[in-house]
Amino acid sequence: MKKTVLSGVQTTGALHLGNYLGSIKNWVKMQEEYNCFFFLADLHAITIDIKTSELNNSIMEVLAIYLAAGLNPDKVTIFAQSMVKEHAELSWLLNCVTPLGWLKRMTQFKDKAGSDQCKACLGLFAYPILMAADILIYKADIVPVGEDQKQHLELTRDIAEVINRRFDKEILKVPDILISETGTRIMSLRNGLKKMSKSDIADFSRINLKDSNDLIYQKIKKAKTDHLSFISYDKKTRPEISNLLDIYKSLSKESMEKIINNYQNQGFAKFKEDLAEIIITNLQPIRDKCLELMNDKEYLLKILHKGAEKAKIRASETVNEVKKQFGFII
C-alpha cells in the first residue's frame, strides 16, 4: 500500500522559483511513488489582508502552475482547502486540546505579526493549528516541507500525540517530516541571508514563475554576489553566490564541484548569463502552459471540484472518528 504524502502552497502573491524548487518540483517526482494530496492553502491566505478578486485569481493561478509543472490530477488529489469544510472543523477540535503556550513559542507568528502583535488577527496566531488539521485529516505518512516549517510540523506531531494519549488509541497518524537536501531553501537574490519570498516588497529579490525571459535575465544580472572575483561555495561566508550556485545545481543536475570548476576562470558575468539561460529553459514551458490553462477556467474548476470530492471522503472519515471520541453525536 502506498504511503500518503500531503503538502500545499498558500494562495497569496506570485509563486516564485523558491516555491518551485523547494516544493512543486519535488512533488512531481513523488506522484509516481506515493498517494499524494496537494492542496491550495486558501484558508491560510486570508490571515493577511487580501482582496476578493486577488484571492480568486490566485487560487486559479496556483492550480494552473501545479498542472503546468507536471502534477497529474489523475494520479494525485489536487483541491482547494476551503472546498473541504472538514479542515476547519478538525482545526477547532485541535484548538481545544492544544496548550496556548505551544502556540506562543511559534517563531513565524512573531516574524509575521511584527512589533505590534496585538493588531495581528487570531487566524495568524492559530495558523499552525489549521496547518496541523490539514495534515492530520488525511493521516499523512510524510509531509515534505521547507526548513522554516519544521517547527510547525513538530507541533503537528505533538498535537497528534495529545489526541492519541487522551483517547488511549491511535486515532491520528503522527507524520514524518521530509526536508530534502537540495532546493528547499532558495534565498533572496538581494540578500543571501533571507529566504526568497512572495511578500518581499523588492521584486528583484525573486524570480517569479511568470516572469518574462528578459526580466529573468535582468534579475540574475543584478543579483547580489560579493567583492571576491572567483566562484566558490560557502553558505556562511559567501551566502549570495552560494545561493546562485544552489539554483544552478538544482536546475542543471550537475554536481557542485563540476559547476565551480567550469566557471573557475570565467567570472560572474558568464556564470550569471548561463544561470539565466538554465532558469529560462526550465521555467518557460511552465509559464506558457500556465497561461494556456488560465484561459480555460472551466477545466480548472472541474479539477478543483473533482479533487475536493475525493479529499472529502478521507477527511470526513477522520473528523467523524475524532468527533466520536470526543462524544459528539455522528
From Swiss-Prot:
Subunit structure: Homodimer.
Main subcellular location: cytoplasm
Residues binding ATP: Q10, T11, T12, G18, N19, G146, E147, D148, I186, K195, M196, S197, K198, S199
Compartments in which it is found: Cytoplasm
Molecular-function GO terms, alphabetical: ATP binding; tryptophan-tRNA ligase activity
Binding site for L-tryptophan: D134
Pfam families from the UniProt entry: tRNA-synt_1b
Organism: Rickettsia typhi (strain ATCC VR-144 / Wilmington)
Gene name per UniProt: trpS
Name this polypeptide is given: Tryptophan--tRNA ligase
Any one GO CC term of the record: cytoplasm
'KMSKS' region (motif): residue ranges: 195-199
This protein's record includes keyword ATP-binding: yes
Cytoplasm in keyword set: yes
